[in-house]
């Protein structure tokens, strides 16, 4: 029985599945949008959203560190929490530049948003094997939408 089993296996062993998730997430964070199969997009969406949530927390800690004075005794605890969250994100990608981009550029856009950082748009079927393709993209923030209008 599959009670409470959430993750899709995508017909791959654990190590290959993890590498696939990390690769798709990396491309999504670097480019903002990717085209992949619907099954892969649905599988990577929770992974990406959890990373953005951690990055949001790190961004909030960084903001609070900048607002407080250097003499504040709680500032060291905030710094350690910020570093711990960044290291947790870095564990998946092993790329400090990407972690910096996620925490300082991407997560800041979603500070006021409670989840739903990505969207999946179905685009049709692939020609070779008729696999259903989807676009997985980061949701734009309201400030970006207002600039376009």
Swiss-Prot record:
Cellular component terms per the entry's GO annotation: cytosolic large ribosomal subunit
Originating organism: Kosmotoga olearia (strain ATCC BAA-1733 / DSM 21960 / TBF 19.5.1)
Domain of life assignment: Bacteria
Segments forming a coiled coil: none
NCBIfam families, per database record: L17
Gene Ontology biological process terms, A to Z: translation
One MF term in the entry's GO annotations: structural constituent of ribosome
Similarity field: Belongs to the bacterial ribosomal protein bL17 family.
Keyword tags: Ribonucleoprotein, Ribosomal protein
Pfam family, one: Ribosomal_L17
Species lineage: Bacteria, Thermotogati, Thermotogota, Thermotogae, Kosmotogales
Transmembrane segments: none
UniProt cross-references to PANTHER family, sorted A to Z: LARGE RIBOSOMAL SUBUNIT PROTEIN BL17M (PTHR14413:SF16), RIBOSOMAL PROTEIN L17 (PTHR14413)
InterPro entries tied to this protein: Ribosomal_bL17, Ribosomal_bL17_CS, Ribosomal_bL17_sf
Protein name according to UniProt: Large ribosomal subunit protein bL17
Binding partners and assembly: Part of the 50S ribosomal subunit. Contacts protein L32.
């Amino acid at each position: 029985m599959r009670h409470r089993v959430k993750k899709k296996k995508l017909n791959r062993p654990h190590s290959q599945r993890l590498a696939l998730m990390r690769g798709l997430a990396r491309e999504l964070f670097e480019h903002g949008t990717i085209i992949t199969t619907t099954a892969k997009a649905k599988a990577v969406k929770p992974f990406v959203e959890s990373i953005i949530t951690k990055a949001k927390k790190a961004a909030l800690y960084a903001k609070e560190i900048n607002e407080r004075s250097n003499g504040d005794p709680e500032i060291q605890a905030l710094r350690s929490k910020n570093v711990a969250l960044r290291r947790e994100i870095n564990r998946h990608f092993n790329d400090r530049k990407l972690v910096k981009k996620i925490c300082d550029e991407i997560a800041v856009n979603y500070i006021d948003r409670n989840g739903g950082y990505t969207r999946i748009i179905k685009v049709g079927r692939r020609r070779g094997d008729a696999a259903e393709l989807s676009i997985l993209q980061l949701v734009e923030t309201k400030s970006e939408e207002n600039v376009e209008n």
